[in-house]
Amino acid sequence: MALALLEDWCRIMSVDEQKSLMVTGIPVDYEEAEIQEVLQETLKSLGSYRLLGKIFRKQENANAVLLELLEDTDVSAIPSEVQGKGGVWKVVFKTPNQDTEFLERLNLFLEKEGQTVSGMFRALGHEGMSPATVPCISPELLAHLLGQAMAHAPQPLLPMRYRKLRVFSGSAVPAPEEEPFEVWLEQATEIVKEWPVTEAEKKRWLAESLRGPALDLMHIVQADNPSISVEECLEAFKQVFGSLESRRTAQVRYLKTYQEEGEKVSAYVLRLETLLRRAVEKRAIPRRIADQVRLEQVMAGATLNQMLWCRLRELKDQGPPPNFLELMKVIREEEEEEASFENESIEEPEEGDGYGGWNHEGDD
């Protein structure tokens, strides 16, 4: 970042970047005379120079200055930092071989990818470029063009690492390395969301983890619907390989869950919601009637006061049942109203309290 700033600044000032320095980290309250005093002392081995300008760098909350060296200087004599008043100032400069190093790294990178610089230019529509002209192009332009090439490259061709799924076959006798279906499905559902590729590539990666009947099912659902999504494929696996017993267990656990002693109705509904969603995921309860089932279970499994019972009964009779948040809002409002009423009852003085409650037996 600092080197790029040096190069841009030199272009603006029309000076040779190989004969220029940039000093950064200078406190903003330093005057030019104070800066010159420090630099003359610390850079005297470089010979004469002139200060071309000063800018403020917001990211450092400090100033930077550009210097032009007026004499030929050995780059090995240029310090990487100088001790200024109030801290260390960084010295940024460009070595003569940095452009060559960049080109070497670029060629090495493209070689590993099976490409060439000329091929990169052709892919971007720059047919006139040849290997002979590449050294004449600035590293900044090459870096920009390389970034374009990476951005336009087909996503599956880019080198990437991805979390692979464990093997699943769906066989009656699973292999020792296989996970139970429920464990595999939970892992697969999470991991496929992380894969930064197209749906087609996701389905290919999913198929790589399948064997036997599971792989056969994958081929069948794709043949029936070539545009099927990965999520729909996993849903098909649930229907075929999912445990029916686990569905019944989820349904019974939900229907047999009641409000516990001392538990608020809102806390019961929140606990119940986790079980309901699990039952819906296992297809033990149809998603389309989840709101209705929730309301009925709350009315059957909770201890409700008369006011809340009437409100819930009204919601059930009048129209579409409330969703989770709507139901929770009704219950919380009733709980707050009931708590407010109880507080008022406690604060209200009972008969015989106050000044009129004194014992006057001693009065005549």
Swiss-Prot record:
Compartments reported by the entry: Nucleus, Nucleolus
Q: Where is this region: Disordered?
A: 335-364
* Record's GO cellular component terms: nucleolus
State the source organism's domain of life.
Eukaryota
The main location is nucleus
Query: Where are stretches of biased composition, namely Acidic residues?
Result: 335-353
Residue ranges annotated as transmembrane are none
Q: Where is the composition biased (Gly residues)?
A: 354-364
Q: Which family does it belong to?
A: Belongs to the PNMA family.
> What name does UniProt use for this protein?
Paraneoplastic antigen Ma2 homolog
Q: Which organism is it from?
A: Macaca fascicularis (Crab-eating macaque)
Q: Species lineage, top-down?
A: Eukaryota, Metazoa, Chordata, Craniata, Vertebrata
As recorded in Swiss-Prot or TrEMBL, the protein's gene is named PNMA2
